[in-house]
Amino acid sequence: MINAFAINDSRLVRIDEDQTDLNTAIWLDLLEPTGEEREMLQEGLGQSLASFLELEDIEASARFFEDEDGLHLHSFFYCEDEDNYADLASVAFTIRDGRLFTLRDRELPAFRLYRMRSRSQRLLECNSYEVLLDLFETKIEQLADVIENIYADLEELSRVILNGKQDEAFDEALNTLTEQEDTSSKVRLCLMDTQRALGFLVRKTRLPTNQLEQAREILRDIESLQPHNESLFQKVNFLMQAAMGYINIEQNKIMKFFSVVSVMFLPATLVASTYGMNFDFMPELHFKYGYPMAIGLMIAAALTPYIYFRRKGWL
């Protein structure tokens, strides 16, 4: 699918996909393009597109480079999968002959939000670099919202976990905590990747003054968000350690109970074993009150360590 946009009255407007209109486009957004659409761009605009496999490369030389096909940036965008778990999608940006090409394999919130804003938002420079920076700016705003949501969720999780009551809510809090840790790690990767992409863009291109300042402003926003995200990691680790501590305490209580019970019944077991031996010519075997005496000894043998443990404060 090809979403083509041109400039009209300093605003982005969507245009048809026929070849004539594509020549006037400033932004070509390709969402899972078919083979025919790739060939159309190659024949009409002379632009070859990267494969989705190439988008998975993580080394800097494969994500940020410049060649005869233009300036290339591959950047991660935060999204959620069909199960609402945090995920990252890699988007290829190519700028050539004043035209921006974006290649992605799924719909992304940042792109959807920017398209909605572009209906009323005017462009200052009306060029492809401004569209690129606006998309990055929208992405950082989205990441800031994600960080704020994690903060709010961790506040609720703190109350449940630090309460120490291990119930169904405690188990659910642990599951949510692991999800938040995964989300925070993906946000950190996205911030670092965007920082590298913008750094490459600033070094390799001669941006107009306004756009250069916009790029630097985005970089400052990233630098301000990174400490917040790191503090989230620390809080997640603290809550995880606290939860593990409460679990260990509960397990120790259980082991302590079984240990005390085993010690309590060990003397009684010894008495029962001794009483149960059947040897001839032993006067105890013919003692009239031998059975109640043995029962009494067993009870006394069990109560004695119990009372001793209680006085020591071990129970």
UniProtKB/Swiss-Prot annotation:
GO MF assignments: cobalt ion transmembrane transporter activity; magnesium ion transmembrane transporter activity; nickel cation transmembrane transporter activity
Bilayer-crossing regions: 257-277, 289-309
Catalytic activity: Mg(2+)(in) = Mg(2+)(out)
Motif stretch (Probable selectivity filter): 276-278
Sites marked Essential for ion permeation: 252
Intrachain S-S bonds: none
Recorded family membership: Belongs to the CorA metal ion transporter (MIT) (TC 1.A.35) family.
Protein name listed in UniProt: Magnesium transport protein CorA
Gene from which the chain derives: corA
